[in-house]
């Protein structure tokens, strides 16, 4: 199935925010339902959730959006890109859309942003899903090498024109090898089109500076960490057996630091993109957790 067939039933549009300019969103579901925001990882875009937005829209008012500097949202070059700015972007987006409270789910960098948002704007949160989230300690040598590898693969896609193969290599890092068949030409070419835009290339060194810093440090850590002990909301660590950087033991070590935490490990073999690699299982877990607090 193509991305646009997956998006049938969703509205793709742009909204203006005070500090972050034009933001691309994908929206589905009834607006009187509980809101659910979906956030992608570093270098990502709303297509990461193409398989989830419409199905989850049967239960929630779903909004996925491109971070500033990402996807087809505005590319600002007059700011730095710590993870905290994406939390502020989410707050402004909620304000513009007239949404007072929402469930928040983020993958990778989006998971880190979820944790930062929950601490900074607790009154705006319902339940949280930290999906293969960044912002927790890396505890293995393999995890540190995974981070260095990600930075290296990313660097091949800016500063010079990206290619189909350079994009494909970076996207293969995201997905468990047994699921590489899910990387369609359409998905790879969609990211290639985004990364080839002059505004993206101009902004990329700022967006990816956090990866470059991590590589220089040997992959020992990333800038910005979640203050898990300060998260008051119910939070689900949604993990996979083949997650790069942070393996299951890293999630298990983070779990006791959450006051109201749960851990779910995907039954299907997945890498860093469980929402794309096993959407039916992912969506079922999300719906059950956000409606009942159980997994």
Which ranges hold each PLM region?
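Conserved HGGG/HGGXW glycine-rich cap/lid loop of the alpha/beta-hydrolase fold
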Residues: 19-72
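Active-site loop/oxyanion-hole signature of alpha/beta-hydrolase fold enzymes
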Residues: 26, 64-109, 113, 120, ...
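Conserved catalytic-core motifs of eukaryotic protein kinase domains, centered on the activation segment
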Residues: 48-50, 73-79, 139-142, 248-249
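Flexible "cap/lid" loop of the alpha/beta hydrolase fold
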Residues: 119, 126-165
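Conserved alpha/beta-hydrolase catalytic His-Asp/Glu region
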Residues: 161-227
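Conserved loop-alpha-helix segment in the C-terminal half of the alpha/beta-hydrolase fold
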Residues: 225-270
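Catalytic active-site module of serine/aspartate enzymes centered on a nucleophile-bearing elbow/loop
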Residues: 260-295
């Amino acid at each position: 199935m193509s991305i646009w067939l997956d998006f049938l039933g969703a509205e793709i549009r742009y909204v203006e925010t005070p500090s972050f300019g034009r933001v691309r969103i994908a929206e589905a579901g009834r607006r009187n339902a509980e809101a659910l925001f979906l956030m992608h990882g570093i270098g990502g875009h709303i297509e990461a959730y193409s398989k989830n937005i419409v199905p989850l829209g049967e239960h929630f008012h779903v909004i996925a959006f491109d971070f500033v500097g990402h996807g087809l949202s505005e590319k600002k070059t007059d700011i730095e890109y710590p993870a905290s700015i994406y939390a502020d972007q989410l707050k402004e987006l909620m304000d513009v859309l007239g949404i007072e409270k929402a469930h928040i789910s983020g993958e990778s960098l989006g998971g880190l942003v979820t944790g930062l948002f929950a601490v900074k704007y607790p009154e705006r949160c319902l339940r949280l899903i930290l999906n293969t989230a960044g912002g927790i300690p890396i505890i293995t040598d393999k995890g540190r090498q995974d981070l260095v590898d990600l930075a290296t693969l990313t660097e091949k896609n800016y500063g010079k024109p990206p290619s189909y193969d350079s994009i494909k290599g970076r996207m293969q890092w995201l997905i468990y090898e047994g699921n590489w068949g899910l990387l369609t030409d359409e998905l790879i070419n969609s990211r290639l089109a985004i990364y080839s835009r002059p505004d993206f290339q101009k902004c990329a060194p700022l967006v990816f500076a956090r990866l470059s810093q991590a590589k220089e440090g040997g992959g020992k850590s990333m800038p910005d960490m979640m203050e898990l002990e300060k998260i008051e909301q119910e939070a689900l660590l949604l993990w996979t057996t083949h997650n790069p950087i942070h393996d299951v033991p890293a999630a298990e070590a983070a779990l006791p630091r959450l006051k109201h935490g749960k851990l779910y490990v995907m039954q299907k073999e997945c890498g860093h993109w469980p929402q794309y690699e096993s959407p039916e299982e992912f969506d079922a877990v999300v719906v059950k957790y956000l409606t009942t607090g159980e997994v």
